[in-house]
Design a protein with these regions (language model features):
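Short, structured surface patches at the beginning of a domain
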Residues: 1-151
Length: 152
């Protein structure tokens, strides 16, 4: 042991919001607070996509974040929720596998899942994203059905 300290982790924050500046600030503040809890974490940058929808090709900040990960500039990403990253299981797992291959870990704050420390993260995320997809389909079906709720 040489007594040298490891270099701090370069941690990025990824936020995606519809159009609410307030929701964005809450996401940023919450993730920044997590970074401050770790002396060996350095805030690298904050990537923010507004009202871009679930497709990755419509998210310029997401694409920039992935490019920075491929360049080795990011060690860890903090995201509010799995659904902030991806809305379907296949897309979520594709991104997580690429990040894992690059040595980049990701921490989902709402679900309290960290790919660095949770050995069962892939199984959990598969299950969670599948449930989220079913939930979104149910909501979409209810919104487009001919059933009109009765309000009393």
């Amino acid at each position: 042991m040489s007594g040298q300290k490891n270099a701090p982790l370069n941690v990025a924050i990824y936020c995606r919001v519809g159009f609410s500046e307030y929701a964005l600030e809450i996401q940023k503040q919450r993730a920044a607070a997590v970074i401050r809890e770790h002396d060996d974490w350095n805030l690298a940058t904050i990537y923010t996509d507004f009202g871009t929808g679930p497709q990755f090709n419509r998210r310029p900040s997401f694409k920039m974040m992935m490019a920075d990960c491929r360049k080795g500039l990011i060690d860890k990403i903090l995201v509010r929720s799995i659904s902030t990253l991806a809305r379907d299981t296949w897309s979520c797992m594709k991104v997580l596998r690429e990040l894992s291959a690059l040595g980049v870990t990701i921490r989902f704050l709402d679900e309290n899942v960290d790919t660095e420390t949770d050995s069962q993260w892939m199984e959990f995320l598969n299950f969670y994203s599948a449930l989220s997809a079913i939930w979104r389909e149910e909501i979409g079906a209810a919104e487009t059905s001919d059933i009109v709720p009765v309000i009393q």
